């Protein structure tokens, strides 16, 4: 292993000088002697000098400190030993539960599976959330993006998906917290403990591994923590489960993929690269592709990923969310307008899309009901201007009926969440897909035209709506 010395420190960027014959390779991990600081080589400047990004604080470092080349990229522990643990970008435990008991370590920089190794799946993944299951269904082994501005419910939606999928799904999950609030990471850990997904008595019985690089971390950590989490998920996908002899089906949750882009922007600026549109790094598409192409399903197992995507200033054409769109199978767009009406989850039923919304995949009935719901909502959207100017009285009887049904559909797309019970006091509801399809089919057919629209708000199944309407009727009488 070659050794060098620090010659320059500018924030998180350090230049290290090595003997010209022993210059480290790009992405090699370097260790600063006498500290716990790890550096990752980003550029070779010539004359034996490499430019690196620190994976941690550079406080206390100074010029001429000796640095050792590890001879390989950053590696993280993988396998059953990671379950139930919270780790940082380097795989070090941060939950104060002792060292991670792992037999293997894998490099975080890996090749994406080849075209021949990949496999496609059309199997649906039921989430129990009506609006998602009906209008933007998820595929097992697919990639899903939750798009939304600040405060419209990305993290709450993701927590509910974890609650509904990960708790019912018998497989394993990996949660990568990329540049989000430490409080949210802490809440998530305690919720997982209460749900029994993290078993602190016997970690091997846990179902989730957690990797955190939070908001207060240096940009190097936030840039690489998604790769650390992905590497752990890849291990579960690619290695055989002793029970089945096949790779596993893994769930990968990333909150928030925008912070990954943002960390790349910071690192790019620190390295002196010329910025591109809106100040983003010129390598934005490449960096996003390197991450997303690895999140895929192979012949041995699958990775189903759910990624929260912050949308700056609610602008979906911003380069960061726009680049992310291209990689996803389903996009769930959260709308501030819908949130302002008090309808949660605030999913935009006309903006959200899924590759699975195809009659050959989901069946004719589901497809026709989903399109019928969207047609009613689209017509209501077109009529809103007329209603605002002339009022409801100027509409034809047919259009009035569309408006009444659309308002009921809008309210019925809301749903109480399990993870929000502590705030709302309303018990969470899981609605099976077949019930969702039957309920909306009946609403657009006019079977519930007689019920008041308030009865549809924050209900689970249609039976609950009927019961609410009866209660309202009896209390009014």
From Swiss-Prot:
Location, primary (coarse class): membrane
SMART domains in the record: AAA
Species this chain originates from: Psychrobacter cryohalolentis (strain ATCC BAA-1226 / DSM 17306 / VKM B-2378 / K5)
Signal peptide: none
Binding-site list for ATP: 148-155
Compartments (UniProt record): Cell inner membrane
Alphabetized SUPFAM superfamilies for the sequence: C-terminal domain of alpha and beta subunits of F1 ATP synthase, N-terminal domain of alpha and beta subunits of F1 ATP synthase, P-loop containing nucleoside triphosphate hydrolases
Oligomer status and interactors: F-type ATPases have 2 components, CF(1) - the catalytic core - and CF(0) - the membrane proton channel. CF(1) has five subunits: alpha(3), beta(3), gamma(1), delta(1), epsilon(1). CF(0) has three main subunits: a(1), b(2) and c(9-12). The alpha and beta chains form an alternating ring which encloses part of the gamma chain. CF(1) is attached to CF(0) by a central stalk formed by the gamma and epsilon chains, while a peripheral stalk is formed by the delta and b chains.
Family: Belongs to the ATPase alpha/beta chains family.
Pfam families: ATP-synt_ab, ATP-synt_ab_N, ATP-synt_VA_C
Gene Ontology MF terms: ATP binding; ATP hydrolysis activity; proton-transporting ATP synthase activity, rotational mechanism
Main enzyme class: translocase
InterPro entries reported in the protein's UniProt record: AAA+_ATPase (IPR003593), ATP-synt_VA_C (IPR055190), ATP_synth_F1_bsu (IPR005722), ATPase_a/bsu_AS (IPR020003), ATPase_alpha/beta_chains (IPR050053), ATPase_F1/V1/A1_a/bsu_N (IPR004100), ATPase_F1/V1/A1_a/bsu_N_sf (IPR036121), ATPase_F1/V1/A1_a/bsu_nucl-bd (IPR000194)
Recorded GO CC terms: plasma membrane; proton-transporting ATP synthase complex
Protein name, as recorded: ATP synthase subunit beta
Gene: atpD
HAMAP family: ATP_synth_beta_bact (MF_01347)
Record's keyword terms, sorted: ATP synthesis, ATP-binding, Cell inner membrane, Cell membrane, CF(1), Hydrogen ion transport, Ion transport, Membrane, Nucleotide-binding, Translocase, Transport
CDD domains, alphabetized: ATP-synt_F1_beta_C, ATP-synt_F1_beta_N, F1-ATPase_beta_CD
Source domain of life: Bacteria
Topology in the lipid bilayer: Peripheral membrane protein
Function: Produces ATP from ADP in the presence of a proton gradient across the membrane. The catalytic sites are hosted primarily by the beta subunits.
EC number: 7.1.2.2
Catalytic activity: ATP + H2O + 4 H(+)(in) = ADP + phosphate + 5 H(+)(out)
């Amino acid at each position: 292993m070659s050794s060098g010395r620090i010659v320059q420190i500018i924030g998180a960027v350090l230049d290290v000088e090595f003997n010209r014959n022993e210059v480290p390779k790009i992405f090699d991990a370097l260790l600063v002697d006498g500290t716990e600081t790890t550096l990752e080589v980003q550029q070779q400047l010539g004359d034996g000098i490499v430019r690196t990004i620190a994976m941690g604080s550079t406080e206390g470092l100074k010029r001429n400190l000796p640095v050792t080349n590890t001879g390989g990229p950053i590696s993280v522990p993988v396998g059953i030993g990671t379950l139930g643990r919270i780790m940082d970008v380097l795989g070090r435990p941060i939950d104060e539960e002792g060292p991670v008991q792992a037999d293997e370590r894998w490099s975080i920089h890996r090749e994406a599976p080849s075209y021949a190794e990949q496999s496609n799946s059309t199997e649906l993944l039921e989430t129990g959330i009506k609006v998602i299951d009906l209008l933007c269904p998820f595929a097992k082994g697919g990639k899903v993006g939750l798009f939304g501005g600040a405060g419209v419910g990305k993290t709450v939606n993701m927590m509910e998906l974890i609650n509904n999928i990960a708790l019912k799904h018998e497989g394993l999950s990996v949660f990568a917290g990329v540049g989000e609030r430490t409080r949210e990471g802490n809440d998530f850990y305690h919720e997982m403990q209460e749900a029994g997904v993290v078993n602190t008595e016997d970690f091997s019985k846990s179902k989730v591994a957690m990797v955190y690089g939070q908001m207060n971390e240096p940009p190097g950590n936030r840039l690489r923590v998604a790769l650390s989490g992905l590497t752990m998920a890849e291990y579960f996908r690619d290695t055989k489960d002793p029970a089945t002899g096949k790779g596993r089906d893994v769930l990968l949750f990333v909150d928030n993929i925008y912070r990954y882009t943002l960390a790349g922007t910071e690192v790019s600026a620190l390295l002196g690269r010329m910025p591109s549109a809106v100040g983003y790094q010129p390598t934005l598409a490449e960096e996003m592709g390197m991450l997303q192409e690895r999140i895929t399903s192979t012949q041995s197992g699958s990775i189903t990923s759910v990624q929260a995507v912050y949308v700056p200033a609610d602008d979906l054409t911003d380069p960061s969310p726009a680049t992310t769109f291209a990689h996803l199978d389903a996009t769930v767009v959260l709308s501030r307008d819908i949130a302002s009406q008090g309808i949660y989850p605030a999913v935009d039923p006309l903006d959200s899309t899924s590759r699975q919304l195809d009659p050959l995949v989901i069946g004719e009935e589901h497809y026709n009901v989903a399109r019928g719901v969207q047609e009613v909502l689209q017509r209501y959207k077109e009529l809103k201007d007329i209603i605002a100017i002339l009022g409801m009285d100027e509409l034809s009887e047919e259009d009035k009926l569309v408006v009444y049904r659309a308002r009921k559909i809008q309210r019925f797309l809301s749903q109480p969440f399990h993870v929000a019970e502590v705030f709302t006091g309303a018990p969470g509801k899981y609605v099976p897909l077949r019930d969702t399809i039957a309920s909306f089919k009946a609403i657009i057919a006019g079977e519930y035209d007689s019920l008041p629209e308030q009865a549809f708000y924050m209900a689970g199944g249609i039976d609950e709506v009927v019961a609410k309407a009866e209660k309202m009727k009896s209390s009014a009488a």
